[in-house]
Every structure is written in structure tokens, then in C-alpha cells.
Design a protein with these regions (language model features):
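Amphipathic, heptad-repeat alpha-helical segments
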Residues: 62-94
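Short, exposed beta-strand-loop hairpins at the edges of beta-sheets
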Residues: 120, 197-216
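Short, structured interface segments
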Residues: 120-137
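Bacterial signal peptide processing site
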Residues: 17-20
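Sec-dependent bacterial lipoprotein signal peptides
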Residues: 1-15
């Protein structure tokens, strides 16, 4: 375990929409089994939930959706808790408030998405994970390196099983994204809009914004 680097903090803010320019990676290797449990970010409905903001003053389509949806409202409240806790830390990034305002603008752009609810949900889950991963003093998981059939860029996965949504950070060259556990009939699967990562019997099949990769974990790559 290592302290999360500042490099990941910059890259993750672009993760939700970042798309790579060219493909990457080759060959074969070994098995690094990581078995995430199913995410549990949103509690089951037990009654009305109001978000952290006044729904009578909702200023965007995204906020109106949050006010009408239990799961989104629960995510909004969780984000408000995580953000307030980070903002109160003496070592909090000086631009944290500005970044949060930037995130709100990004969330509100979900009106352009084909699946608006999925877009808003992923925005919340991603922002919560960003704040937790980049929290001062937070421990980051060691990266697992892979050899892929296209070797033009390095490919790694870092797993954060102690965080709310048990996310992973997928890195392909200079592009990064936060992805989340998804149901799988067998093996392990993570994903988000535009990305799918499936690992079964030691081999990973990846779709990274349209780039298809077949990868094998590199033995003894925990300190990459």
C-alpha cells in the first residue's frame, strides 16, 4: 500500500469523459486474482429521501432528477458528507471547492447523454471515489500491471476495495478512468459508460472506449 499520488488526482478528474488517442499492449503472463464484492453505494429504499440541496430551488435537469429518485438522492447525500469531510481537513487541496463547482457543471451536462440517469449516477459515484482516493493520507492500492496483445501503451489496474463502491482505477497509457464492479456470471467484471473490463481464468478482456485488448496480469507487478 502507498499514499495516493498527486498524478492520479489530476488524471481522475478527466476520467469520466477521457478517451485515448491510440491503442496499447501485448503478450502473456500470470494470474492475479482480485475478487471484488458487489457494490453497495446506494442503500435500499426505506422511506423518502431528500438530497443535500433544496429541491424547490433545483437549477438543472440533473438536480430535478436527483430530487425525484431515491438512489440518486442517497448518492447526493453521500457525496455531500464526503466532500464536507475532505473540505474540513487542514491538508485539503486549495482548489477543492473550485473542483467541486467544476464537477457540478459536469454533472449538469448529463442532459446531453442518451441515458441521463446513468450519466448522473456515474458522475456521483465517480466524484465520491475521486475524493476518497485523493484524500490526504489515503492509502492507495498497488497497481497490477498487464501484458496485452497491443503493447504500444502500458496497462494497469489499481483496486480500492476499502472504499464505498469498491472502485478500480484503469490506466491505459496516459488515460485513466474510475470503473466499478458489475455483476458477472463468472470471473470479475468492472465497467462504466464506454469501458468494460472482464477477467476470467487469468485473462482480461478489455474494451477501453472502443479499443479492444486481451491482457494477462504480470507476475510480481504489485509495485508498479
Amino acid at each position: 500500500m502507498k499514499t495516493a499520488s498527486s498524478l492520479i488526482a489530476v488524471a481522475l478528474l478527466l476520467a469520466a469523459c477521457s478517451k485515448p488517442e491510440t491503442p496499447a499492449e501485448p503478450a502473456a503472463a500470470e494470474t492475479v486474482a482480485v475478487e471484488p464484492t458487489a457494490p453497495a453505494a446506494v442503500p435500499p429504499p426505506t422511506g423518502p429521501v431528500t438530497p443535500s440541496f433544496d429541491c424547490a430551488k433545483a437549477q438543472s435537469e440533473a438536480e430535478t432528477m436527483v430530487c425525484a429518485d431515491y438512489g440518486l438522492a442517497a448518492l447526493d447525500n453521500r457525496l455531500a458528507e464526503v466532500y464536507a469531510a475532505e473540505l474540513a481537513k487542514p491538508a485539503a487541496a486549495k482548489d477543492l471547492a473550485a473542483r467541486q463547482r467544476g464537477w457540478v457543471k459536469g454533472r449538469d451536462e448529463c442532459w446531453k447523454a442518451d441515458d441521463k440517469k446513468l450519466c448522473v449516477e456515474e458522475e456521483y459515484r465517480t466524484r465520491i471515489a475521486e475524493l476518497q482516493i485523493n484524500s490526504p493520507g489515503a492509502m492507495a492500492a498497488s497497481a497490477v500491471g498487464f501484458r496485452c496483445d497491443d503493447n504500444s501503451k502500458p496497462f494497469t489496474m489499481a483496486y480500492y476495495n476499502d472504499l464505498d463502491d469498491k472502485p478500480a482505477v484503469i490506466t491505459f497509457g496516459n488515460d485513466q478512468a474510475i470503473i466499478f464492479p458489475q455483476p458477472a456470471a463468472s470471473g470479475t467484471q468492472y465497467g462504466r459508460k464506454g469501458i468494460t473490463y472482464r477477467e476470467h481464468q487469468g485473462k482480461a478482456n478489455v474494451d477501453f472506449y472502443g479499443i479492444a485488448l486481451e491482457c494477462m496480469p504480470i507476475k510480481d507487478s504489485a509495485n508498479l
